[in-house]
């Protein structure tokens, strides 16, 4: 097979008319040849850090959409499913991903559960990390979220890091806001990347210390604008990622969109493509071709180097997408789960008033971090309830692995004027998280999730919309387009109920993630990410 076009040689920073010859999935020659073909041929895009589960799609369904946007490979951390099903979940993702052409490169989840302050469905200890790291299907140790464990020399954390070093595999970081001496110690442990930088100066400091910074632009956390100006001077040590991407967003685009935005800022296209296509391959030793002789024939054909509209995507010489049509085949897959609770009562979500002021989680648009604010208690019949007028809404986290009392808190900036929204996609333990305007609506939303053994929903009286997620309670058994359509309908209903957030369900899913400050809620209670300890709802 031969393909002609304008060859984009990223390494040598040149573009020339050429012809590529492919045989048995490999490039056997690239020659300069004059022709009239104007399309550009370049290496495929790579998402350098993504939790496939956040798309609510199994890997084989994720692949169908990703290849349309020129994505040929991912660096994927399966810690979402691992928190539900343990290493069995990791192997599920690997085996499902092997059945399609897209090149998934999975890591061994380093923090399952993320902390000891929440209930997960499984534990992956250092012995299981050893087993996973020994596998040729595991390419790295996934993000080390337990940075206090690194800083204070936790024995189990250090053993996990040691096994990654033993097998000569890179270690991913997760250190939002970590600066000065703490970040120096964190890096000295052997941790090489961070995708959690949310300010220019933070990323600049980490780059200066030898860390590779991954610019993240997902459905909830959006750090592109804050960090992109670092790329021209640091392009050899940066990558792009989405981290968490909901299905409706994935349908619109992937890493290709970040390339287009970077070009629009006047950044050199070769530097952009080094970040988007090349750096992940070298850092993670990926089995992905870079448009060189004898490489795997992984490349894309785009209309131009401005908008990066993808005409064709090839993986191992196979045409997997063309002009908006995906050729990734349907795969039959199982739906393993871990959901063990019975329906809740309205009284389960009632809480007495004990103080004039309460701690409130302030959610922030486009960020995973939150603020802690204090607000006057809103009381009815001696009970703390949602203060709809001031947008201080009741929130709960319900343990889905065993019947326990829900943990209750209050949250600002969800904006609901009626009803409730709930999800069993709740990083990282994936218990049920819910925000609502009344205890009754909260209870109804939680019980709908329980009925579906996982999913997302919006409820308002007798009205409700839901998307069932029967694969570990976090992924759909439907295809990407149907899942995306249902998600859009529920997202629209959440906004009809008053939510002003751009992605209310994505933001909701991070309100139980304790490793990102300031204030979060686990199934065990209200938690300060700054002091790494539980705090009381009531302010004394």
UniProtKB/Swiss-Prot annotation:
Keywords: Hydrolase, Manganese
GO terms under biological process: adenine catabolic process
Cross-referenced Gene3D superfamilies: Metal-dependent hydrolases (3.20.20.140)
EC code: 3.5.4.2
Alphabetized Pfam families for the sequence: Adenine_deam_C (PF13382), Amidohydro_1 (PF01979)
Cofactor: Mn(2+)
Domain of life: Bacteria
Listed GO MF terms: adenine deaminase activity
The keyword Manganese is assigned to this record: yes
Record's catalysed reaction(s): adenine + H2O + H(+) = hypoxanthine + NH4(+)
Family, as annotated: Belongs to the metallo-dependent hydrolases superfamily. Adenine deaminase family.
Record PANTHER family: ADENINE DEAMINASE, N-ACETYLGLUCOSAMINE-6-PHOSPHATE DEACETYLASE
Protein name per its UniProtKB record: Adenine deaminase
Species of the source: Flavobacterium psychrophilum (strain ATCC 49511 / DSM 21280 / CIP 103535 / JIP02/86)
Lineage: Bacteria, Pseudomonadati, Bacteroidota, Flavobacteriia, Flavobacteriales
